[in-house]
Amino acid sequence: MHLSVRHSQINGETAVPGSKSHTIRALAIASLAKGPSIIKAPLVSDDTLSCLSAACALGAWIRRGDDSLWQVIGTGGRMIEPARPLDMGNSGTGLRIFSALASLSSSPISFGGDESLQKRPMEPLLAALNDLGAKTESDGGHCPLTVTGPIRGGETSVDGTSSQYLSALLLAAPLAEGDTILNVPFLNEVPYVEMTLAWLKRQNINLKYNKNYTRFHVIGGQQFKPFNETIPGDFSTAAFPLAAAIVTGGGILIRNLDFNDPQGDKAFVDLARRMGADIETGPGFARVKPGPVKLHSAELDLNSTPDLLPILSVVAACADGITVLKNVAQARLKETDRIAVMAHELRKMGIRVEEFEDGMAVTGGKLKPAHVDSFRDHRVAMSLAIAGMTCGADEKEPTVIDSAESIGVTYPTFIDDFSRLGADFYAV
């Protein structure tokens, strides 16, 4: 699908879909719990539906109804052997978490995915699972792969380049036969691990860890219990309408946001404020008032929030001066190399970008329409759409974004929501 975007702004009120990270963790725990769980307001997207299918294939019973809530009857940790490899689509989080859960089964469980997922590194997680007693086979440390358990517990080191490796092991380790000790020499994306720990705390899982998150001791032989939880709005997704209002001079009110939630990407509000944005927040909401905003440059550390790099690079393109986005080398390991891709595509739109190993420097300027490519990365596609909205009203040609169907990975209603709010979008 191609998305054509012309000069426009958004104004109005909206709600963002539920958090993808919370939805996948909820599915993982519910699928292993003994008894019925209820997940309210889940994100229904390509990634979460891949995880839902995986949970069903492993023996969980799930009733979707109208998708306002999912009823999940878990396996109690006794998974069945799937009839075929589990297709995780484009979900890196899902692949890593469900690969770790598969290590609890004595049957071989295989995983596949799309072309992008097959490029995502899996070796650090597979090596840790092997240390804990599983047997794994893979295509050079990548998907497709097979995991045969059960893990028995033990001690291993975990590469913290991606927090997903640690989160996956923390979700599987309580159900291992023995205790598990996880050593983490360094850790990126700390808020995502804190989200996992919050879920484990609600489950009363017995584990200990130090304040620097370098050592975790998980007691084995535990059981997940059924739960009834509501998924909060996704701050990673909320960044897009907030940014669109900021850079186009529009206004937006988002109501379903919980600023007490551990989601790291709520930091978008503070990061944008550091660049001059005026964002009002309160219990459950964030608001940008209509009117022009004079944005200025800043130096932003995105180590905890790598998913914000694409949209913040667009905000930086609309700001005066040179904005530096740094300490976020892991952004190169997402659905695409987001540093390289955003630098390349913004240059097409007339913006000067200097790329370095762990980030980029963006010199603000006047964006011009261009034919750009999302490289099938949902956050890149949405960020480029917002960049296209800022191009001059006198421009005759639109910005055209290739592979815009990738937006369905996390925000399937993006085009409809933005069009309702005033964006000039046309999907072909």
Regions found by a protein language model. Give the residues of each.
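Short, structured segments at the rim of ligand-binding sites
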Residues: M1-V428
